[in-house]
Amino acid sequence: MKLIIFEGIASSGKTTLERLLADKLPNSKIVTEGDTLMPLIENRDQVAAIDYLRKLITVFKKETADYLIIDRFHLTHAFRSHASLKEFSSIEESLRELGETLLVLLTIDTDSIKARIEETMSYRRDQWKKGAQGTLEEKAIYYAEQQEQLKRFQQVTTLPSIIIDTTNKDWENCLLQIEDT
């Protein structure tokens, strides 16, 4: 089994690319953020986050798909629990044991985050809009900070990884970058 983990801030294109990739890959399954994220947006309990991820990995072991396309995983949990990625090293080891793993970090140019969030809010459900509280400006600042932390995590991950800039929404080019890895 091959695992492709998408990380990135809200509105970076994770769902779009996951669906496009699943259409191209035979016998693939998308694991949504509804399955991978703990219910609390700010969970500072690193032990609970790691335990939650371990349980998910146990579920993944039973999966028969050739490709698991995962929407957010340990980088997001490390960010939300204010942990270092080192504290999630056992999770990375377990992911490697499952099979070939690729971590794909999607980014948006910092100057474009506010506009992308605003655009995304126009078509997302009300529940998504409530996810990050505050004004549009405050949300943009929060997501810019999250993106910078995710980039720092990407630099120290032990998993094979790539960063893809999705500012221009060139989804075909993004798919090519993933396929070339």
Locate predicted features.
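Charged helix-capping and loop-helix junction motifs
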Residues: 84-91
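Conserved lysine of the Walker
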Residues: 14
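NTP-dependent small-molecule kinase module
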Residues: 144-181
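A glycine- and Lys/Arg-enriched "phosphate-lid" helix/loop adjacent to the NTP-binding pocket
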Residues: 95-149
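P-loop (Walker A) phosphate-binding loop of NTP-binding proteins
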Residues: 9
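Hydrophobic anchor at the beta1->P-loop junction of P-loop NTPases
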Residues: 6
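Loop/turn-to-beta-strand initiation segments
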Residues: 64-68, 99-102
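Conserved substrate/cofactor phosphate-moiety recognition/catalytic segment
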Residues: 19-67, 80-81
